[in-house]
């Protein structure tokens, strides 16, 4: 066990975690220069396209240190985006130390701080690494000063490297071997292993990634999942190189995988403890904190025939993304579906894209919503995250929405544009901190509902990519909230309802009505599209009717003949409007639900 090091790379988004992981893999000789490609651990197309890491990935690297010692390094590459902090916490629970990466040109950013605190909570050894020293804009001394002042770490211990050019990679590996302690655990104790990831293979069943803390597991053993008591016989164990590499056993301190033919997807839970059925441990390992979803949205299949297929895909997807929470839901307009909870808007987008790409699902997602707390006139309180279940306004005494404390770090020159953006999003109580010359940290309280839609994208736009953002939920505060209904031909469309602040209601209503007007095809009669709060109409668009020229066959003659034909047409249209139902195409829902991003 003294020959094992378990470590993770944590950093702000885009500070070079995946590039450094690529270089470490190359240095360990797992890939030849010919096989090499960028972002080697990011397996999903979507990760490579967006240039971000979504899933933590594990790889075991063989390394001979400078003093000739052979060491096994278990590296877990983590995501940097605020929405995937749960993936980071799972990775940290399996490590003894971390490399905290800081970009030499950008310095310490919001997510760097958030990840540092997470590593401190797990009591891990922290090695600061200053990356991107090859850039012309790199300011190493200033970055060292920030590491001292903002992170409270000894900057003289920081390792300098350029992951892109491959400089300083040996220094990073030596620091891992020298400074990160080997895992502690007892080989002769009963098996206890923590599941930190899992994915479904249609041939082999569920493949579980775990960190063994005590004991050992080998093929033929009968294991038990402690959360539900399910038992299975182990078929194969091994470690992760770039693909799975079978081993005779996994011993205490090792990170690897276990295949035991689990076909019941719900039996394997991330955060669960594996033990031997014949000699179980008395108590499970402390898992991870429960996930609290922040953003809610409903997912419906475009064709109602695909409902069961979507249910199956969600169950398999949940294995690989423990942060997703879902339950059954139904809508008059869209049929059967699922109400899902996400960690943020990027998480929502990724779930949508992965369901479409990896599981071949065609889906519609409703407007994202947050969880509101309502106090009713009878004194009871209720939590609502779905506009369909928003009670009658007469019954509501007060409504409260979640507020966050946002921490925004930006170059000083963007101060005006960022403050305007925050105030437009109903931000209050700004506080300013100047960590280093030319940089400002703004702390501000904002409603989560305003941040959920497009705040992060807009912040990146106004700061030309230099702004960084992190947030913590603080509390629910009383706000003037209303339910905005969209009516088409005087009928409510439940899938388009949303809960908004009264000040923003008209702006939203106009936006949705105008978008629907473009999408709904013309009928034989006029269609009114209205936005309403209760019985009060606050916005309207009209889809004009097709019109047949009924007077075309009248050549000259008495005007009363033409008038009679026009009156007859008018009556027919009126009758048609009373009985005619408007077909809203699925494309209209998709277009309107994207209206918030534009």
Swiss-Prot record:
Record's keyword terms, sorted: Cell inner membrane, Cell membrane, GTP-binding, Hydrolase, Membrane, Nucleotide-binding, Protein biosynthesis
GO cellular component terms listed in the entry, alphabetical order: plasma membrane
Primary location class: membrane
Reactions this protein catalyses: GTP + H2O = GDP + phosphate + H(+)
Pfam families, A to Z: EFG_C (PF00679), GTP_EFTU (PF00009), GTP_EFTU_D2 (PF03144), LepA_C (PF06421)
Domain tr-type G, residue spans: 2-184
Family classification: Belongs to the TRAFAC class translation factor GTPase superfamily. Classic translation factor GTPase family. LepA subfamily.
Organism of provenance: Syntrophobacter fumaroxidans (strain DSM 10017 / MPOB)
Enzyme Commission code(s) on record: 3.6.5.n1
Major enzyme class: hydrolase
Physiological role: Required for accurate and efficient protein synthesis under certain stress conditions. May act as a fidelity factor of the translation reaction, by catalyzing a one-codon backward translocation of tRNAs on improperly translocated ribosomes. Back-translocation proceeds from a post-translocation (POST) complex to a pre-translocation (PRE) complex, thus giving elongation factor G a second chance to translocate the tRNAs correctly. Binds to ribosomes in a GTP-dependent manner.
Domain of life: Bacteria
PROSITE patterns: G_TR_1 (PS00301), G_TR_2 (PS51722)
Location relative to the cell: Cell inner membrane
Annotated InterPro entries: EF-4 (IPR006297), EFG_III/V (IPR035647), EFG_V-like (IPR000640), EFTu-like_2 (IPR004161), G_TR_CS (IPR031157), LepA_C_sf (IPR038363), LepA_CTD (IPR013842), LepA_IV (IPR035654)
Gene Ontology biological-process entries: positive regulation of translation
Signal peptide segment: none
Binding site for GTP: 14-19, 131-134
Protein name in UniProt: Elongation factor 4
Listed GO MF terms: GTP binding; GTPase activity; ribosome binding; translation elongation factor activity
Topological category with respect to the lipid bilayer: Peripheral membrane protein
UniProt keyword annotation of Cell inner membrane present: yes
